[in-house]
From Swiss-Prot:
GO cellular component, one term: cytosol
Name of this protein: DNA mismatch repair protein MutS
Keywords: ATP-binding, DNA damage, DNA repair, DNA-binding, Nucleotide-binding
UniProt-listed Gene3D superfamilies: 1.10.1420.10, DNA repair protein MutS, domain I, MutS, connector domain, P-loop containing nucleotide triphosphate hydrolases
Amino-acid positions noted as binding ATP in the UniProt annotation, renumbered to this chain: G609, P610, N611, M612, S613, G614, K615, S616
Function: This protein is involved in the repair of mismatches in DNA. It is possible that it carries out the mismatch recognition step. This protein has a weak ATPase activity.
Source organism (scientific name): Pediococcus pentosaceus (strain ATCC 25745 / CCUG 21536 / LMG 10740 / 183-1w)
Gene: mutS
CDD domains, alphabetized: ABC_MutS1
Length: 873
């Protein structure tokens, strides 16, 4: 009976290893390739666009297979991991040429979305966080820990509820979360809805080498979740983790808190529409020059400060850098030459660092004395702490300078990595190699002269070693018996001589010894650097902080931001405030600034005005101003006085949660409820059009109730925009509410947005005018105008002589009267066709009615630009 293809020793070995990693693609090393078999091959060929073939094609049970070259494997692994898959890398643990029987193979690493460390250059400013969560049944709290294996960062927190877990995980943009059996299945499903891979780690046991990482933790909840995280890391990585830093406990309430919906709505790091960084607040603020500075900026954006002393400390350092342009420019220039110290230290620990990495490390360290000199020149006390901690790690820089060749290759096992003069024995081997190769060159010249064959050459390959090659046309010129024939080619013959083979032995022996010694020396150097990883990580933190501060200074000067005054009272006073991102996109000249004035007696601004007039921008503008101020950055205004907020809640936009089947209205109510439940008098609440997702009266009733609840119970500073104009009467009964509106005027039937916030309620919503700006057909717009007039007339008929407070909604008629039927039919009458003015007539009419004395020069210029654009069309 023939043997099944799956019953060979190699395939039995494959299945044994695969069964240990059932949820991962197994990259199984065979020679120079990683092979995938069975379902891995079928699915992998589709995801990686590889040709699907088969092992033992002609057998009754051929095995599906595909493969990738080992030198290109990382790209394919990245593709799979980026799509949320795990990859188990199975290596040959012995040389197939010397192995007795089946080659021993082992999985040396399990690469997962949360543990991948080989980040591309475009991801250099992104952290890749692996998180862990468990539920402590005794305290009824959640343990939450995270690490970035590429940088060694390790942090832990105790969270009150699962919503807080979600907020932390989404804020970190984690791709993988490690759980145990304590977490409810429904919670795991929530992670999956957010495209977070859930990995199980039930057994918890960390090695003695890592136990020191938890020695500063006091809570059992913190200790257990960190151990859970580290156990998973140990199990999957199977590598040295010397660069992992001691676990640091943090308290989310020590920072300005924003739930994931608020961060999403405010587009802090990703645009809602495109998912890209460009057009976000992070994009605007990022003038960092180093990868670790870029990552720290994002961390500061995710967690602005709430302690006034810390905020002022950052502001003061930014002010110094704003005031010293030349020193700041020099600092930027030096930081540009600093590579990613955090990830270089990580590669040293992992043992994956190469010669080029060490040259980058040396180059970076050599910039630190120059950075110190710039700070010393500033001679400002606010930078004394930075100077104290900017350790240039000069001993490591000197070691690399003396040992590693500037042109070191990527490979660490093929030689040419250690400098001449670093090690005497290595120099001896190299001299032997160089003398031998000179002897080869001399022999080639000698043989050409002796034989008269000018094309004779001496070459080398790994199969035959050194050889003498002569073309067929010149074979007759070789003296009889001079060479020993070794290989026949199509157009040439290759020969050897005893003397050549002896010299080959000497050269190759020297080469092998040289290469082996170089690798040994490189490993010794790597171990010396590994002992200084903590110093390198501390230095990286100092450089990153300097980088973010100079970035704040650059954008503050470039966009004319001002240093905000942070107060302990609750008043907000912003003069000429701007939305910094919108201003950058539009250009400074065309942006209309706005004031925001909410004294201690004003808790709620009720905002009315047309669609597209800038209500949402005005609200986001305040949120971004608060976030920037509490990050320590300057803000987009001419003056700003702000309280320190503890939380920001937003409901802006109508992004349905389609994945979990929740409607716009349900999401709206949930997001509003978070503010009502968790908000305090120190919070900022931004509600845009609450209630629009349901019937008119329902929406209006809910909107009013929410406003009243905030006014009477929460007392948070609140911006509440609405189309329910009836709500503007609330200022009569709610003493801490103030009406404002976005100005707009009609000119010859056209709507002109002033984009200026004015006191009092808006008189109209101008919906049809906005539809006109959107390009809807004239016929439709005219019809809408007729319908609107009829509806307004009907509403007036019902309300004439009767006071209708917001709290008493007008009842709906249960029966239709003949008059009402006639009114409804009239809505569908064919309207008369309007006479449309020419662009020149429209401009002339607008110019005639313009009051130039009430306009600023900039407003006049903007109006002229609009007219010119219209006439050119």
């Amino acid at each position: 009976m023939p043997q099944k293809t799956s019953d060979t020793p190699m395939m039995r070995q494959y299945m044994e290893i695969k069964n240990q990693y059932p949820d991962a693609f197994l990259f199984y090393r065979i020679g120079d390739f990683y092979e995938l078999f069975y379902d891995d091959a079928v699915k992998g060929s589709q995801l990686l666009e590889l040709t699907l073939t088969a092992r033992s094609k002609n057998a009754d049970d051929p095995i599906p297979m595909c493969g990738v070259p080992h030198h290109a494997a990382q790209n394919y692994i990245d593709i799979l991991v980026d799509q949320g898959y795990k990859v188990a890398i199975c290596e040959q643990m012995e040389d197939p040429r010397t192995a007795k029987g089946m080659v021993k193979r082992e999985v040396i690493q399990l690469v997962t979305p949360g543990t991948t460390t080989d980040k591309s250059a475009e991801d250099a400013k992104e952290n890749n966080y692996l998180t862990a969560v468990n539920f402590d049944s005794k305290t009824k709290k959640y343990g939450f820990a995270y690490t970035d294996l590429s940088t060694g960062e390790l942090k832990v927190a105790i969270l009150d509820d699962f919503d807080s877990v979600i907020n932390e995980a989404v804020g970190l943009q984690t791709k993988e979360i490690v759980t145990d059996e304590s977490l409810a299945e429904s919670f795991e499903e929530r992670f999956k809805e957010l495209n977070i891979l859930v990995s199980k780690q039930s057994e918890v046991e960390i090695s003695a080498e890592l136990s020191y990482l938890i020695q500063d933790l006091t809570s059992s909840t913190e200790i257990e979740v960190v151990k859970q995280l580290l156990t998973y890391v140990q199990t999957t990585q199977k590598r040295n983790l010397a660069h992992i830093q001691k676990a640091v406990a943090y308290e989310p309430s020590f920072f300005l808190r924003m739930d994931h919906a608020s961060k999403y709505n405010l587009e802090l790091t990703r645009l809602i529409r495109t998912g890209k960084k460009q057009g976000t607040l992070l994009w605007l603020l990022d003038e960092t020059k180093t990868a670790m500075g870029g990552r720290l900026l994002k961390q500061w954006l995710d967690r602005p400060l709430i302690r006034k002393k810390e905020i002022i400390s950052r502001q003061d350092r930014v002010q110094v850098l704003v005031d010293h342009f030349f020193e700041r420019s020099n600092l930027q220039e030096e930081l540009t030459k600093v590579y990613d110290l955090e990830r270089l230290a990580g590669r040293v620990a992992f043992g994956s660092v190469n010669g080029r990495d060490l040259i980058q490390l040396k180059t970076s360290l050599l910039q630190i004395p120059k950075v110190r000199h710039i700070l010393e020149e500033l001679s400002e006390p606010v930078f004394d702490d930075a100077l104290e901690h900017l350790d240039p790690v000069s001993d490591i820089a000197e070691l690399i300078q003396n040992a590693i060749d500037e042109d070191a290759p990527i490979s660490v096992t093929d030689g040419d990595i250690i400098k001449d003069g670093y090690h005497a024995k290595l120099d001896e081997y190299r001299d032997a190699m160089r003398n031998g190769k000179k002897w080869i060159a001399d022999l080639q010249a000698q043989e050409r002269a002796t034989t008269g064959i000018k094309t004779l050459k001496i070459g080398y390959n790994k199969v035959f070693g050194y050889y003498i090659e002569v073309t067929r046309a010149n074979l007759a010129n070789i003296p009889e018996g001079r060479y020993e024939r070794k290989q026949t080619l199509t157009n040439a013959e290759r020969f050897i001589t005893p003397e050549l083979k002896e010299k080959e032995r000497i050269i190759l022996e020297a080469e092998q010894k040289s290469t082996d010694l170089e690798y040994q020396l490189f490993k010794e150097i790597r171990e010396l650097i590994k002992k200084q990883i903590e110093r390198l990580q501390d230095l990286a933190k100092q450089v990153a902080e300097l980088d973010v501060l100079q970035s704040f200074a650059v954008v503050s000067e470039k966009y004319q931001f001002v240093k905000p005054t942070m107060t302990k009272n609750h008043a907000i006073e912003i003069k000429d405030g701007r939305h910094p991102v919108v201003e950058k996109v539009m250009g400074h000249q065309s942006y209309v600034p706005n004031n925001i004035d909410m004294d201690d007696n004003t808790d709620i601004l009720l905002i009315t005005g047309p669609n597209m007039s800038g209500k949402s921008t005005y609200m986001r503008q305040l949120a971004l101003t608060v976030i920037m101020a509490q990050m320590g950055c300057f803000v987009a205004a001419s003056e700003a006085t702000l309280p320190i907020f503890d939380q920001i809640f937003t409901r802006i936009g109508a992004a349905d949660d389609l994945i979990s089947g929740q409607s716009t209205f349900m999401v709206e109510m949930q997001e509003a409820n978070r503010a009502l439940k968790d908000g305090t008098s120190n919070s900022l609440v931004l509600f845009d059009e609450i209630g629009r997702g349901t019937a008119t009266y329902d929406g209006m009733a809910l909107a009013q109730s929410i406003i009243e609840f905030i006014h009477q119970n929460v007392h948070a500073k609140t911006l509440f925009s609405t189309h329910y104009h009836e709500l503007t009467e609330l200022d009569q009964s709610l003493e801490h509410l103030k009406n404002v509106h976005v100005g707009a005027v009609e000119q010859n039937g056209n709507l002109v947005f002033l984009h200026k916030m004015e006191d009092g309620p808006a008189d109209k919503s101008y919906g049809i005018h906005v539809a006109k700006l959107a390009g809807m057909p004239d016929k439709l717009l005219k019809r809408a105008s007729v319908i609107l007039e009829k509806l307004e007339a009907k509403d007036q008929a019902h309300s004439d002589g009767v006071e209708t407070p917001v709290s008493k909604a007008t009842p709906v008629e249960s029966e239709q009267t003949p008059t009402m039927i006639e009114e409804q039919m009239a809505l569908f009458e064919t309207p008369t066709k309007p006479v449309k003015s020419s662009p020149k007539e429209e401009v002339a009419n607008q110019l005639e009615q313009l009051n130039l004395m009430d306009m600023t020069p900039m407003e006049v210029m903007n109006q002229l630009y609009k007219w010119q654009k219209k006439l050119r069309k």
